[in-house]
């Protein structure tokens, strides 16, 4: 019998990847600097934050469509990989060539090195065509996930614009970006953001040395107009805050093979449940299970449904709102 939490409701999640990629993951047996290297394994995948989220949603049996820019022979390869997985997409064609990213894993040390391309330059006409497509999305999504880097030629406030435009049509947005892209996007007050600790520190301009600091940071982000702030903490799980509630979700210990894609899988879990307007507790449980399942897979592979099913009963979700209120009260009286 399928657990109730894995029964996906009919919500449609659209993802936007402004800078898709063809990810090439190479494994070498001892990376040599200033010397010859020979890879032992090569895997190729369609990449980019939104695309990863769509792939993970599809793996879990959810409904999704991936949007973004695509171009050239590399772009066609990305579409072929998505076709083979059965992931629906509706990209805006461009003259430039979709980028190629390289991930190099040293099998001796298990260290990973990423080499990311900036991406093709997007013309004003190409961006205008993309905007028109977004205004005519059919069927209308229940939730839009947007994130990752933006290629050259894209306006600096692009995420702000996308989020504001979605709000006009009553569509909620999840923003998963960093740096200036995140800082600008937050000003449009998206439904949810999911920075990691480093990204949250950069957004708020302060260090977050412990759990209580992270909890307060999540509440401060909610105070900026975001409905749900989720801060991911790697193997320690996530902290999720709304104006009334703070949740802590923790995965079991797992033998990690690769952390690549874990954050995107976490977003997929949140989107699947919140897109269907299910409780935040269930969304956090599935999100952490998907994130933990992703680190069990090698290279840039994402979570497998079978691993998610095995991990779900082991995910602990606690309401720590009272703990926060007590800490604040103690601080005020001391």
Predicted features along the sequence, with ranges:
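Conserved phosphate-binding/catalytic region of the ribokinase-like
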Residues: 168, 183, 211-334
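Conserved N-terminal subdomain of the carbohydrate kinase-like
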Residues: 35, 58-142, 310-334
């Amino acid at each position: 019998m399928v657990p109730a939490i894995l029964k996906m409701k009919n919500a449609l999640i659209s993802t936007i990847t402004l800078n898709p990629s063809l990810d090439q993951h190479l494994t070498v047996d001892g990376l040599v600097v200033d010397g010859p290297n020979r890879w032992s394994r090569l895997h190729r995948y369609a990449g980019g934050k939104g695309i990863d989220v769509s792939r993970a949603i599809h793996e879990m049996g959810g409904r999704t469509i991936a949007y973004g820019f695509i171009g050239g022979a590399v772009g066609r390869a990305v579409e072929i990989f998505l076709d083979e997985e059965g992931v629906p997409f509706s990209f805006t064609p461009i003259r430039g060539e979709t980028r190629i990213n390289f991930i190099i894993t040293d099998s001796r040390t298990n260290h990973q090195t990423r080499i990311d391309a900036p991406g093709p330059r997007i013309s004003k006409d190409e961006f205008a065509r993309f905007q028109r497509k977004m205004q005519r999305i059919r069927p209308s999504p229940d939730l839009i996930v947007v994130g990752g880097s933006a290629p050259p030629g894209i306006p600096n406030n692009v995420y702000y614009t996308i989020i504001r435009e979605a709000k006009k049509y009553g569509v909620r947005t999840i923003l998963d970006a960093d740096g200036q892209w995140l800082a600008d996007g937050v000003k449009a007050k998206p439904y949810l953001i999911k920075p990691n600790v480093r990204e949250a520190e950069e957004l708020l301009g302060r260090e977050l040395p412990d759990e209580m600091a992270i909890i307060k940071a999540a509440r401060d982000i909610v105070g900026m107009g975001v409905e749900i702030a989720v801060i991911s903490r790697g193997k320690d799980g996530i902290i999720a805050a709304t104006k009334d509630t703070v949740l802590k979700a923790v995965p079991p210990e797992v033998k990690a093979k690769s952390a690549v894609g874990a954050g995107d899988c976490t977003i997929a879990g949140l989107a699947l449940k919140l897109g269907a307007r299910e409780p935040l507790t269930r969304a956090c449980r599935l999100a952490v299970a998907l994130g933990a399942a992703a680190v069990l897979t090698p290279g840039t592979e994402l979570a497998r449904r079978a691993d998610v099913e095995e991990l779900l009963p082991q995910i602990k979700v606690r309401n720590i709102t009272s703990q926060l209120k007590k800490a604040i009260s103690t601080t005020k009286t001391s």
